[in-house]
């Protein structure tokens, strides 16, 4: 199973909450590495420098992320009632769950990136 965490708070909200010197934001307003950990670990207070005001994090995303990682840890399959069907990844269809405020399982979502990486180190 492959996912792309694409949810990100508004940059200005993170700066307003933390101050410019303490905020960790993407200059492009995109999700950053490890941004999902507060959601996975159900710890909205865990990293406000990255996610902003914990009280403003989307509760539905906190709940669905926690439930999905729990299902995967328990069964080896992330599927549960809170998200759409998550199809497993294989080299022909390349399904990926794209996670924003909602969840979308997309086929070959990042084809250009995948082809570039495959040229360097083929998926087996």
Language-model regions, residue ranges each:
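C-terminal helix-and-tail extensions that cap enzymatic domains
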Residues: 1-124
